[in-house]
């Protein structure tokens, strides 16, 4: 065998490979698929660029496992239907969050006294007054046991209290004052009887004789 035989055989192999991998042609933006051709991601149904039609159609690039191949519809994303569902999803999200908020157990929330209901069944706490407020109310009560509406408003603004608080304080103070004076009046007759007891004098002794 001559050397020309080996050269020709080697050259024939390269030519066969060249047909399998053709030289890429210069591509342009016009040869790329447009948006209508790329409607589905990974679908593989759109046309290929003009530069590589024979490359992907070669038997080397065929799926060696036809039993495990996926149809184009299995991974095809319909963008149009997804875009139509976006408003529906956005409308359902606030409702879902609101429903989840109402269904949360009360143990996750801390209830403060001011958050409780103010209905008739509510147990009212005892109103506390500062030392300054108590002193001013006592001074006013010393001069006036009953307040007019105008005076009550003035005191409420001066002490940063409500008219209802002023009214209740004076009612309680009058009850306390009456109770104290009633106790004093109950004790006073006993002392008066002792002081008004009859005493024997020298003239009475003479009359008895």
From Swiss-Prot:
UniProt induction comment: By derriere.
Motif Antp-type hexapeptide: where in chain: 111-116
InterPro entries: Antp_homeobox, HD, HD_metazoa, Homeobox_antennapedia, Homeobox_Antennapedia_CS, Homeobox_CS, Homeodomain-like_sf
Pfam family, one: Homeodomain
Key words of the record: Developmental protein, DNA-binding, Homeobox, Nucleus, Transcription, Transcription regulation
Gene Ontology molecular function terms on file: DNA-binding transcription factor activity, RNA polymerase II-specific; RNA polymerase II cis-regulatory region sequence-specific DNA binding
Annotated Polar residues bias: 26-38
Keyword Nucleus assigned: yes
GO process terms (BP): anterior/posterior pattern specification; regulation of transcription by RNA polymerase II
DNA-binding annotation, residue ranges on this chain: 122-181
Region named Disordered: 25-44, 179-209
The keyword Transcription belongs to this UniProt entry's keyword annotation: yes
CDD domains: homeodomain
Subcellular location: Nucleus
Cellular component GO terms, alphabetical: nucleus
Similarity comment: family membership: Belongs to the Antp homeobox family.
Function: Sequence-specific transcription factor which is part of a developmental regulatory system that provides cells with specific positional identities on the anterior-posterior axis.
Protein name, UniProt field: Homeobox protein Hox-A7
Native organism: Xenopus laevis (African clawed frog)
């Amino acid at each position: 065998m001559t050397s020309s035989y080996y050269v020709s055989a080697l050259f024939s192999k390269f030519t066969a490979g060249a047909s399998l991998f053709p030289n890429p042609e210069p591509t342009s933006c016009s040869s790329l698929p447009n948006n209508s051709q790329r409607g589905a991601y990974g679908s593989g149904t759109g046309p290929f660029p003009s530069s590589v039609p024979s490359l992907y159609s070669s038997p080397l690039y065929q799926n060696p496992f036809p039993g495990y191949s996926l149809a184009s519809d299995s991974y095809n994303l319909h963008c149009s239907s997804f875009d139509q569902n976006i408003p529906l999803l956005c409308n359902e999200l606030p409702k879902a969050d609101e429903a989840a908020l109402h269904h949360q157990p009360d143990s996750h929330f801390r209830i403060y006294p001011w958050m409780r209901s103010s209905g008739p069944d509510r147990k009212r706490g005892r109103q506390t007054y500062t030392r300054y407020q108590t002193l001013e109310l006592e001074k006013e009560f010393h001069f006036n046991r009953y307040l007019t509406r105008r005076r009550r408003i003035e005191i409420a603004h001066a002490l940063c209290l409500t008219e209802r608080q002023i009214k209740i304080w004076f009612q309680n103070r009058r009850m306390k004052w009456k109770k104290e004076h009633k106790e004093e009046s109950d004790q006073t007759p006993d002392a008066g009887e002792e002081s008004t007891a009859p005493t024997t004098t020298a003239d009475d002794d003479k009359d008895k004789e």
